Amino acid sequence: MDAWLERLQREIAAATAGLKDTDWHRAPQGHWNCAQIVEHLGRSYGTTAKMMELALAAGQPPERRAPKFKETIARVLIVNLGIFPRGVKAPAMVVPSGNDGPEALAHAMESLKRMDKALADAEERWGSGSVGAHFRLGPMTAAEWRKFHFVHGRHHIRHLRERASDPQ
């Protein structure tokens, strides 16, 4: 597994280790609980994996184009500087649907492995150029996708740790 994704996997496992049923469902009013956060992460990994798998099956990357200025700025902030903005609304395809915590965790870990393989396969086929476009960050290399998911995951792992340590 790629080093960024392996580190992400370890951090998710550590942040969710020992969570009881009540811990999985704890959240401040109007915010996602731990189960929803982990489900969201799993859906984001699964969506990236599926995009890569479909492109590989079709024999070409999903989108090769020059990035727009706004996409470049967002990608530099997130991927290069590790700054993930707060309050960005998740797209519908990665919004949690209500899986329980252990189920969401198992799915997230499996999706992370699937995404790692799909990104490695795409990188092997298309090299170090763009392998697909993120809806807000534009065209990205496999390395940028991995770093994006690491930064995005760390953003949410912080929330997992806050909720797990707050007895409410």
Regions found by a protein language model. Give the residues of each.
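Active-site-proximal binding-pocket segments
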Residues: 16, 23, 48
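Short, charged, low-complexity loops and linkers
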Residues: 1, 28-30, 95-97
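Catalytic-site beta-strand/loop segments enriched in glycine and acidic/polar residues
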Residues: 12, 18
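Short, contiguous alpha-helical
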Residues: 27-79, 120-168
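Acidic/histidine-rich alpha-helical segments that form the ligand environment
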Residues: 8, 73-128
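Short helix-to-loop capping/linker segments positioned immediately adjacent to catalytic or ligand/cofactor-binding
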Residues: 23-26, 102
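Extreme N-terminal tail/first-helix region
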Residues: 1-11
